[in-house]
Design a protein with these regions (language model features):
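Bacterial N-terminal signal peptides that target proteins for export
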Residues: 2-11
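A conserved position within tetratricopeptide repeats
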Residues: 54-61, 74, 112, 146, ...
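N-terminal leader/linker segments that initiate helical-solenoid repeat arrays
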Residues: 2, 17-86
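Terminal, low-structured helical/coil segments at or just beyond the last alpha-helical repeat
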Residues: 28-37, 41, 68, 75, ...
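Register position in tetratricopeptide repeats
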Residues: 97, 131, 165-166, 198-202
């Protein structure tokens, strides 16, 4: 049970934090130069267009492009349009990575209070709540994320992680399958689907 718990915590950090951390750092750092691997045309800057494309990348050879595209999507998700609010998000993520969850939750709560329409603020606070075993609050925040952005693959994966931690394997499988449909090249999610299909016989209520 302890090993499984540690594995789920590590998976939560990998799935819920990685893309947002990359994206916010990109936004607050230097502007990428001309050697950026793949540019996205302005017409395709809408995350919904990018999400449509992400769902078509299903082959083993698509993993690098899918990860790049997921990062592009999260880069758009992690910008509020306000430098002050973007900084609150970055401070919350930094505090979470430092293990200071009280400070992380404080920053992210300030963010959700000031920008309740900003899905990523709720998503990152859900991560902090999960990592401090506050599952009810984490689930509530994930629900808010999915109201604002139903195709938030990180939040869906996070929902799967929490439900599995709570022993709801069928609910977890449904959540991971939903994330897989949006981001089929995500290895952590694919492994979770395989594991839970084996555990449940592939059945969900």
């Amino acid at each position: 049970m302890i090993d499984q718990r540690v594995t789920l915590k590590a998976l939560a950090v990998a799935v819920l934090c990685s893309y947002a951390t990359y994206s916010v750092a990109q936004g607050l750092g230097d502007t990428p130069g001309p050697e950026t691997p793949s540019e996205i045309a302005p017409l395709e800057a809408d995350p919904q267009i990018l999400l449509n494309r992400l769902g078509t990348l299903t082959g083993e050879g698509d993993a690098v492009e899918a990860t790049r595209l997921a990062n592009e999507i999260q880069e758009r998700w992690t910008h509020t349009g306000s430098a002050t609010l973007d900084l609150l998000l970055q401070r919350g993520i930094d505090a979470m990575q430092d293990g200071d969850f009280v400070r992380a939750i404080a920053h992210l709560t300030a963010l959700t209070d000031h920008a309740p329409e900003f899905a990523e603020g709720w998503n990152q606070r859900a991560t902090a709540f999960f990592l401090t075993d506050r599952y009810g609050e984490a689930l509530s925040d994930i629900e808010q994320v999915l109201i604002l952005e139903p195709r938030h693959f990180g939040a869906l994966a996070g929902l799967g992680i929490i439900l599995e931690e709570l022993g709801d394997e069928q609910g977890a499988l449904r959540a991971f399958r939903a994330a897989q449909q949006i981001f089929p090249a995500e290895e952590n999610v694919n492994r979770s689907v395989e594991r839970l299909e084996a555990a449940t016989g592939g059945r969900t209520l």
